[in-house]
Every structure is written in structure tokens, then in C-alpha cells.
């Protein structure tokens, strides 16, 4: 059980983050002269090898901290609102906490996407001290299989640790498409996320060739059910996925003109 001091601390951080998110959304609507969300990869190496993923290797070294600082400073100079740290697996970078702290020092929202395998109580507390804003874990199935080891069975203890120790917002993203064998697993994952006090989203995953395909009937039903569970925030501005799910064309417009 969370003590009252921790609940108050989380509530304060949640309210403060919400104000910053609203400010970012308003700024993005008023002006198109700056990036909204920049993804940055400090570590391409990953500790897993999911069959559908082509965004990792097993040999790359961490990007040096001075180069990461240069890139983050430049993003700040451009007026970037959000920096999402991904990979590979960002928790493998030995200076990750300093990278997160640099993002926050510039007033940008600091998010991270991780597979969650390397989370411990101490690691979560270090992320708190670095002032991480958002953490997302993508869980692909209930039981691990040859496509993905990012399963609820393996990661549920990590989720419980996050529920106990994290002061930052946690979102659990489940997926359909891309060779995932049991689409209904996404519903079980989403319900578990809500039980633990997290938010839940669903994504359409690409196949091994990097291509997004329209969803099958069962996948569309699960996708619709999951979308109804999502809460409104800037991270849910993803209506383009509805078109992908139904095989409809998206009409993109570049914010830069």
C-alpha cells in the first residue's frame, strides 16, 4: 500500500505534468515553427531479439554522453516540447539518468520507452530522482513465444514494482497485428495495467519487413475495445491508427510546411 506522503507526491507530479502537457498542446496548435516530439536513441543495442523488430542490434556501444548533450541542447534550441528516449534498450546506457536530467533541465517533457526487463526498485527510484515524466512499456502477449518475450507473465513483477515505487506516469502499450498470435491478449494486458493504476494504449505493430497492414476482423474488434479503454492525453493523438486498422489512407501534412 502507498503511504499518504507518496500519494500526495504522485498527485502533485501528475497535476504539474498535466499543466505542462496542456501548455505544450496549446503551443503546438498556435505555432508550427518547432518540433513537438523528438525520439532520441542513446543505445541501439537491446537485451532482447523480438522477431518483428528491426530497430536494434546486439553490438552497438552507448552514444557518448557529450554527444547526447549536444543533441539535446540542439533540440531545446529548436523549441522541442517532448523528448522520448528509446532504443534498442535505453536502460542499457550507463549515463541514462544524466540524459533524462538534461532533458528536464531544458524544460522539455522527458519520456522513455523500455522493454522493462532491467527495472528494479532501485532503478525506478533513480528514474524518480532524474525527474522522468513518462515511461512506456510495450507488452506483446500474456505468455512468451517465438515472436516476443515481452509478456505479461515475465513482466508482471516489474509492473508491480512500478506501481509501488514510480513517481512518474506509466503507460502500458499492448499491440495487435504484426504476427502476434493471440490478439485478445491485448485486452488482458490492458485490464492489468488499469488494475495497477497505469494508463493503457494499443498500437498496431509492423511485420518483420517493417510494413503496417490492415487488421483482420478479430484484431479490429480487440483494437476497438482497447481504444475505448484509453484516457485522453497528448499521447493518445493517434487517430491515424484507426485508418491503418481499416485499410484507409492517411493524408499527412508536414508541420514544417
Regions found by a protein language model. Name each.
Residues 1, 63, 109, 129-134, ...:
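Radical SAM enzyme [4Fe-4S]-AdoMet core and its adjacent flexible, acidic
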Residues 49, 256-257:
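Cysteine-cluster motifs in flexible loop/terminal segments that predominantly coordinate metals
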Amino acid at each position: 500500500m502507498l503511504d499518504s506522503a507518496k500519494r500526495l507526491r504522485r498527485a502533485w507530479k501528475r497535476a504539474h505534468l498535466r499543466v505542462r502537457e496542456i501548455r505544450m498542446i496549446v503551443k503546438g496548435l498556435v505555432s508550427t515553427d518547432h518540433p513537438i516530439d523528438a525520439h532520441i536513441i542513446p543505445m541501439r543495442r537491446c537485451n532482447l531479439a523480438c522477431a518483428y523488430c528491426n530497430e536494434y542490434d546486439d553490438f552497438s556501444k552507448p552514444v557518448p554522453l557529450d554527444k547526447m548533450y549536444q543533441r539535446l541542447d540542439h533540440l531545446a534550441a529548436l523549441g522541442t516540447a517532448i523528448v522520448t528516449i528509446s532504443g534498442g534498450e535505453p536502460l542499457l546506457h550507463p549515463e541514462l539518468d544524466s540524459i533524462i536530467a538534461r532533458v528536464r533541465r531544458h524544460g522539455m517533457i522527458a519520456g522513455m520507452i523500455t522493454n522493462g526487463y532491467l527495472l528494479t526498485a532501485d532503478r525506478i527510484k533513480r528514474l524518480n530522482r532524474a525527474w522522468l515524466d513518462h515511461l512506456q512499456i510495450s507488452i506483446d502477449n500474456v505468455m512468451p513465444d517465438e515472436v516476443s518475450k515481452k509478456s505479461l507473465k515475465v513482466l508482471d513483477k516489474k509492473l508491480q514494482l512500478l506501481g509501488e515505487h514510480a513517481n512518474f506516469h506509466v503507460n502500458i502499450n499492448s499491440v495487435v497485428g504484426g504476427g502476434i498470435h493471440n490478439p485478445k491478449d491485448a485486452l488482458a494486458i490492458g485490464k492489468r495495467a488499469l488494475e495497477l493504476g497505469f494508463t493503457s494504449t494499443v498500437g498496431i505493430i509492423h511485420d518483420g519487413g517493417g510494413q503496417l497492414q490492415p487488421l483482420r476482423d478479430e484484431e479490429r474488434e480487440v483494437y476497438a475495445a482497447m481504444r475505448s479503454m484509453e484516457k485522453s492525453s497528448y499521447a493518445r493523438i493517434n487517430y491515424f491508427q484507426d485508418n491503418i486498422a481499416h485499410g484507409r489512407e492517411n493524408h499527412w501534412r508536414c508541420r514544417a510546411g
